[in-house]
Amino acid sequence: DIVSKGIGSNTTLPILSGIYLKAFNGMLELQSSDLTISIKHQIAANVEEEGETVVSGKVIQNIVKNLPDAAITFEGGERTLSVTCQRSSFRLNTLSAHDWAQFPEFDLEKTCELPSQLLSTMVDKVYRVTSKEASRPILQGISLTVEDNTIRLVATDSFRLAVCDSNTDTPAGESFTAIISGEVFHDVLSMRSMTEKVLIGTTDNQVVFQF
């Protein structure tokens, strides 16, 4: 459910419609990317043999969501991946992990940790005002300002304007500003695995969410 939000639909790069899986050091790492949004999620796993592969995002998502709440076993083969859970078993075709784009590296210039539930409620109030016109990408974003124990979100489609303010504890003397895609902001905060607080950071051309 988490990485599915980053699955691409670019027919010229079919590998982006997949989910990258990597088993290592007692972890299973999942990645998705549409070259605009990249998502990485790690979960604890009993790894008997390390490896990596790419499988169809739509197929693996449909399989996993219909499986019972029990342990799932992944076993790699020659261009295949076997998925087993109790009495259910599937064999999927795979793509080469070597063709998967490396997850973006980033050095955060500024960060801000905020209560996720409060932020989600605020985003819901202004998100509907963001523009749906791709020709004006700046209006598809939500302006976030955190300063003096106040969070402010602003969105507009040039005809309507929505402003939402809330109080929260912030580091004294520090401020944080960013313009974040309204769709991304909304989708990230709607994830079921969202933690009590979310760290938002910026680079010169990226916004990063960590939770």
Question: How would you name each of these model-derived features?
Answer:
Residues 1-211:
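Structural preference for solvent-exposed beta-strand-turn elements
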